[in-house]
Amino acid sequence: ACYWAAEYICAGHYADIWEIIMFFCSKHIHLGNPKLPIYLDLRLTHFKQILNGGYQDNVLKMRNNYKIRKLFGEIISVLCCSKKKHTFDNIKIKKDDFNITKITYKMKADSTTYASRIFKKEDPNELFIGINEFYWNILKSQKNGSVACYWLEWILGFEDICKKENKRYSGGRRSNMPVEGKYQKDVIWMIWECLLLEANNRSKGLHKIMTSLLGLFCLRYKPGVRRRRKYLIYFGINLLTEPLDNTIPIIKNEKIIENIISKINVIYKQIKKNEIRPDTDYLFNNSMTNNNLEKTINKLEKMNALTGFTPRE
């Protein structure tokens, strides 16, 4: 796993590797390591600090940064050592289910006050019932995760239908969501407000985990990632509706992980050994010291003399 992660790193595909990490954590581990989102959120912050330390214009250079190699080596090792749980099944919503008059049998909430806790006047009234049922099912008194997931899919599906009909729904602005201002009106934040509010009603620790899940969900957020990252929401639902073992440590087998990290450069040497490079590789050398810069200029001059080629600046 560390080898293939290193391949992504060498290619500069950091967005892809973070998507894989979030997907695996939320779909295959979730309650097997319930505090894992806190760890990943901290590591994501560390990654951003390294990136903003001078690599924004050339992320490929980060592959030679030992901190980056160590960071992802540790993350992948922690994921591999975490206990795996059942995967979440996709819940399919029938077309008729979007007709409120035909799904009254699914409405179990004993009051309409639950949605009112987070509903804003700008939020679509069509989603009030869905949000109310969602909130009802994540309550401590109910803990019905499967039905809560159904209503999550119902809300996402309702948006999809509106798009097909060239209708656009947006909610009230939720400025507490850590995304660009133009995305703060997305209705998905209504779901997250329900999760955060209920988690806060339970315990500070649970609220911290939920906040970390939100931080991961919001990474470079655009509306298109909602479906791809929905298992982070499933994870959040399960935190509120399934038995939670707070004694599970985030990192197990620390010695094994330390051993892997200590040998992480071996993987990169193997990748370097197998690298297929053109003869002009020196043009793309990341370590441009004065000495090899002069050599590069000399070689370019020789190329120009032989071919009449004038390189663009």
Please report, for each region that a protein language model flagged, where it lies by residue.
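C-terminal alpha-helical interaction modules of replication/initiation AAA+ assemblies
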Residues: 3-313
